[in-house]
Amino acid sequence: MSKYKNSSLLNDQGGVRQPSLSNGSSVLGISNQLPPNSLFHLFSTNNQQSTTTPTTVTIQPPSSSISTPSPTTNNTVSGGGGIQTAGSSTSSASSVVGGGGGTTTPTNSNIVVIESNKEDDKECGTILMEINKGIRSGNLGEQIESILFFSHLIKFHPSPLIVNSVITRLSDIFRTTSNTVKYRILKVFQECSSEIHKVSNIEEVLKRIHSVILSNDPIARSLSLRVLGSVPHLIADKLYIHHSIRTCMQSHDQVELEATIFIMDKLCEISPLFSDSIIEKIHTVIQNVETPPITKLKYTRLFRHMHHSHSIATQSKEMLVGLLDLYPSVGFVSVILDTLTNLSLKHILYIDDHIKFLKNYGFSDSRVVVKVIALKCLQKLAITSPHSQFPIIEIFNIIKETPSKSYREIKYNALLLLSILSQSQYTKILELNQANDNDLIDILYQYSLDYDFKLSELSIQTLVNIIVESTDNNNNNNNNNNNNNNNNNNNNNNNNNNNNNNKLIESILNQTVNNICVILKTQFTTSTNNNTNINENKSTLNKTSVFLKSIIRLIKKDPKPLKSITTTIISLLNEIPYSILKSLFHCLSMCIPMNKSVLNQNGWFKLILDYLNNLIIKENSVQLINNNFNNNNNNNNNSNNNNNNIINRNNNGISNGINKQDCKYSIPMSIFMCIFKTFDENNQKIQEITEQLLPLIQYILENPKPDQLWSCYNLAQLSQRHGFHKIAMVIYSTLIHKVESECNYLWLKGLLSIATLENEISIYSITTNKNNTNNNNNNNNSKILNQLSNYHTSIVSLKASSQQERSLQFQEDFILLHEKYLFNILNLKSFLLECNDDGNNNNNNNNNNNNNNNNNNNNNNNNNNEILLKRFLSKSLIFRQLEQKYQLLLNIQSKSINHTVPLDTKQILESFIFSCNLIVKLIDLIVINKNNNNNNNINANGINHQQEQRYQQHQQSQNQELINYFPLFKFCEFIQKKLNQQHSIPSSSSSSSSTTNPISFLDQVLNGLIKIPMVYPSSFYFKF
């Protein structure tokens, strides 16, 4: 047992933790069938130390090795809390190793790195010695187990010295060992193929592996070919290996032949030399009568890599076209057409000719499989080269002329091809539609209502692509016409064309929306479909289905149809199965930010709330009846059968209302998301909706089912991300007593304190809005200021919940910045109140004083103005610094997760940056007004023009998916537009604009910023 303690293989309960290949051990993924011998013990302990050191290295004297930090070392490294940066680690290194001078710090740190590298080399040397002992063993199992550790050694220590010694040793073993060990060495080469280029004597390694090809064993030759095929870049110009591969093509052993085709496929892809030397031989083998048909097909696929030069590509194309006449069977035609398509994709000059070839050959063939293959090849070409000359009329004719009851695969692939082409060739489709009396669009209308949902969703996608792309094109044309005012005749013609296109697009839009509503009523309701059709549609309609993506894209371009689509979905709440309804509400949640009032009308919210009551309470009541029935059966085994039949009938009558398989133990997160996104802009509405939702949530918490507590935690996160902090507070207060880990308890405690604090701040902002007097505002502001200190208590809990493998630095920085943000806004509000009081007092004094004292009063006013200007500039500097800190947090977050910061996190941080920039701009307006400067253009020291231009570009961007719909950003955009309107007023009307007081306007803006609900980004919550 001491042996397992040293190797860190004890689990939390004190038992031995066996390594597992599926779950993975702490370092290696070793199969649990292998015994934990001394080799595994040595390798696991050494690698546990080496793999944990990159993030938590503790600087020690050179004699000691690098190990995981102890509690004492944590105190010395972390110091002031948080993870130390590179600068702090180097300074500590200089203090330990010796010499405190600034010039000697890099040298001392290099000494420490060299010492650590020496320790790693010693550990690797020890591991290599143990592995060599296992390889020299006479037991085959120990040999294979030892070779297994070579790949792990290279992964965890990919230094050139280790890679060179390991690969050289494996090549020696490969030459003389059995086929079983050869196969294990092949796996090592395949797993470490990206590291083999570090070998210095690669020529010796290749020669030792190549020597096995000359043996009499076909299995050994095939293993040698596959080992060489795992490193094709190293043998791209090795002619002796190329010659051996061509020799192996004559083999009659199937295993060796497949290995030969494998290495030929790898080499033809990267080696022009090998491709040029092998193309004629491949063509000869395919034409040979003795070659099996399956082997001919495998050799035919090699032609897709013959694109390294124009001559090779042309020769390959001619050979493949000749093979079509030689082998007209369906299997050969399918492979040859696919190979020709892949070859054309690599050689762009052949794309247009290949499209014509597919149209003439594929569409004229009466076989269904050939037509489907031709359409699939055209789909590949449409994705790569969407602006080529595709036969659109012929594609519509295939859809129209193909029988409806059969050959649905042809229709599906033809519609899929049209959906791809409609994103780029929408103008051509509309022109051909007008030339054919609207016949093409009518075909899409017809198939959008087809009983086959796959065909209908592709038709809807094609129509939506035409609408969206044509709308963007018309908007661009209108902008160009407005910019070019010289050519009046051309402008009139363009305007007429745009008007005609707009009318056509509007009619297509209306018909498409009507068809979407018809699909919702006919495809997914239980009254119009049998169970088989609904089950088929369940599998196709999910969150990523083409139908829902098309609806989202259409609504993001034009939010008007959202009302009719929402009306249809809500009217069918009791008829659509819950599994489909989840996906539909998820689609609505993506569309609601474009039109937040869509659920807040016609009593739709009440209908949704009633549906939630039926869904949650009835489903749980059915489950309770089932549990009670099972308990009665266990306790009363001798009960009457008639009573059991009555209970069964009652149970079935209740369960018929809701399908238990659809909503088993689940919480309708998509419905809650729709509600949260609808009312997340108003604190007063948030409190009203919260009171209506709390009974449902408390019912779930009081009667939890399996996995529902985790769903409740996700619901709390979702509510906290949309300003419903009271819901999060109720859930966290229940979950905090149900976790086992102390770390999770502290994490929930921190989230609970944050939710409680945000809920109290929102309540104070509501009372401020109702009682809009100065005294009440001051009292509420002082209450909010008193609550800000509680942010630090939540930070303490979050810090206590942090662990070595996860950092909560972003959470701490975000909370601290938000606390500073609120504090500075409230501080600025109190300062503005003082300015208003001082201004009123000065006006009263000026009215009461005599004319003799006017000069003295003017001097005093000038002095007061200078003091106020300095204080205003200091406030402006504070918000600029706060803006820079938010920008720095955004940059750090994007770098820490490989430049893939979540969209909501980026938009929330940009919202705070925008608000700080807006406050700076308003303060600068006040400063200019105090200086009696009528110039509305503010210099660079007042406004961050780069930030303003970035948000204007952000607003005008074509990609609607990146628009920021968070309430804070929308409020700042509204204020920005107001300011731009004021600046656009000409100087002659300055008297009208001067009536607006900048100080009072800034005070109103600050009140609005306080009242906006606080939202938290998704990056704030880590994954368990």
UniProtKB/Swiss-Prot annotation:
Pfam families hit by this protein? INTS7_HB, INTS7_N
Localization of this protein? Nucleus; Chromosome; Cytoplasm
* The organism's place on the tree of life at top rank: Eukaryota
According to the record, the residues making up region (Disordered) are 1-109, 472-502, 842-863
Q: Where is the composition biased (Low complexity)?
A: 44-77, 85-96, 473-502
Q: Which InterPro entries match?
A: ARM-type_fold, INTS7, INTS7_HB, INTS7_N
Composition-biased stretches, type Polar residues, lie in 1-11, 19-36
Provide GO CC annotations from the record: chromosome; cytoplasm; INTAC complex; integrator complex; nucleus
Give the signal peptide range. Answer: none
User: What's a single GO BP term from this record?
Assistant: snRNA 3'-end processing
> What do we know about how this protein assembles, alone or with others?
Component of the Integrator complex. The core complex associates with protein phosphatase 2A subunits, to form the Integrator-PP2A (INTAC) complex.
Q: Write out the similarity annotation.
A: Belongs to the Integrator subunit 7 family.
Query: What is the protein name stated in its UniProt record?
Result: Integrator complex subunit 7 homolog
